[in-house]
A protein has these predicted regions:
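Short, flexible, glycine-rich and Lys/Arg-enriched loop motifs at helix boundaries
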Residues: 1-2
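Helix-coil-helix junctions within alpha-helical repeat/solenoid scaffolds
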Residues: 7, 11-187
Length: 187
């Protein structure tokens, strides 16, 4: 439904503009509207957008519940796109709860499934989630490879909303290396 999409997208815009409380309020409105309309695709869209917003707010508990609900809904209705994204977000939440290996594997599985749907919108952001988990587990080389892929993909597709964050992550990983090159990390 167009209203659910507009509210969901607006929640992200508000977050990026620096209005976290308004973003959450609008996201809740999108979820309520989707539930009231009882349209599976609208519900899946609202749940996914809410998951991303809650990830930005670092609310893994919400995502653990919501990602499972989204995965079940997506499976029931054949929404492969949302099934893949539920895996990514659920993997991030699992990693935040301390299950880093399972979280990384689940994010990777979700990213592969997402790629297989033929879409790539948002992929730089999702790759950033994987890189963060890799960095937390000391897999710095893999984190840097994933971050380079995310940055290149964002530039190639002109999807640059997350580029500054990806660059920040790159610097952080470079500084965490045992033989850190501070000059390279600052670039």
């Amino acid at each position: 439904h167009p209203l659910v999409f507009a509210l969901s997208y607006n929640s992200w815009a508000l977050w990026l503009l620096g209005y976290p409380d308004q973003a959450l309020h609008v996201s809740e409105s999108a979820l309520t509207t989707a539930e009231r309309l009882d349209q599976p695709l609208s519900r899946a869209l609202a749940w996914h957008y809410a998951n991303v917003l809650r990830q930005l707010r670092r609310e893994e508990g919400f995502i653990l519940v919501q990602a499972d609900a989204l995965a079940a809904l997506a499976s029931e209705h054949g929404f492969q796109h949302f099934s893949a994204l539920a895996l990514v977000m659920g993997g991030w939440a699992a990693a935040e709860r301390g299950d880093l290996a399972q979280g990384a594997a689940q994010i990777r599985q979700g990213l592969d499934a997402y790629r297989d749907t033929g879409t790539g919108l948002g992929r730089p952001y999702f790759l950033g989630l994987l890189a963060a988990v890799y960095a937390r587990t000391g897999r710095h080389r893999e984190a840097l490879e994933v971050l380079a892929e995310a940055i290149a993909l964002g530039q190639e597709r002109n999807e640059r909303a997350w580029e500054a964050e990806l660059q920040r992550q790159t610097g952080e990983v470079l500084l965490a290396e045992p033989a850190a090159d501070v000059g390279q990390a600052k670039r």
